[in-house]
């Protein structure tokens, strides 16, 4: 009962009339009016950083498909790495990722991957795989002249559009080269299919 009477007396001391209402106003204690507060208000709010998901890191079109970048290299080109850990290495482009402008070069940018065993008796493995490298870190390479060059585009007399090396004038895109690349790729896929079937 004593606590109830104390509460009632405290409510009666508070007079909430329309003239003395504090709704919508800042509550300031009478002590803070006379004495400046030693605590400074936060001027810069703290930044909240969030890690983006893999599909959110890609730039997308309005239809949610990723924006595909144009690259100066294509599948089967011989390139030389001009910057990074593998600077100076020469290899052939084996895979292209146009959504983030990266390429995979044979025997370049090797990473170690620890593979778990799939079956109970099979041991785990440590394998070396070729990781992607950004296409801006490579330049097209001429095996004949041992020189790197930028790529140019021109139309031949028969109306065929081709790429060529600006320094040497050597044609990169030829029909014979594409036929050889296609045959090699088909042969590789049939070998993989045969080994997986057996």
From Swiss-Prot:
UniProt KW keywords: Chloroplast, Plastid, Ribonucleoprotein, Ribosomal protein, RNA-binding, rRNA-binding, Transit peptide
SMART domains: KOW (SM00739)
HAMAP family to which the protein is assigned, alphabetical: Ribosomal_uL24_B
PANTHER family hit by this protein: MITOCHONDRIAL RIBOSOMAL PROTEIN L24 (PTHR12903)
Pfam families noted in UniProt: KOW, ribosomal_L24
Species the sequence originates in: Arabidopsis thaliana (Mouse-ear cress)
Transit peptide feature, positions: 1-50
PROSITE patterns reported in the protein's UniProt record: RIBOSOMAL_L24
Subcellular location: Plastid, Chloroplast
NCBIfam families in the cross-refs: rplX_bact
Family: Belongs to the universal ribosomal protein uL24 family.
Annotated function: One of two assembly initiator proteins, it binds directly to the 5'-end of the 23S rRNA, where it nucleates assembly of the 50S subunit. Required for optimal plastid performance in terms of photosynthesis and growth. Required for the translation of plastid mRNAs. Plays a critical role in biosynthesis of thylakoid membrane proteins encoded by chloroplast genes.
Gene3D superfamilies: 2.30.30.30
Disruption outcome: Reduced plant size and pale green leaves.
InterPro entries reported for this sequence: KOW (IPR005824), Rib_uL2_dom2 (IPR014722), Ribosomal_uL24 (IPR003256), Ribosomal_uL24_CS (IPR005825), Ribosomal_uL24_KOW (IPR041988), Translation_prot_SH3-like_sf (IPR008991)
Protein name: Large ribosomal subunit protein uL24c
GO molecular function: mRNA binding; rRNA binding; structural constituent of ribosome
Main location: plastid
Any one GO biological process: plastid translation
Oligomer and partners: Part of the 50S ribosomal subunit.
Cellular component per GO, a single term: ribonucleoprotein complex
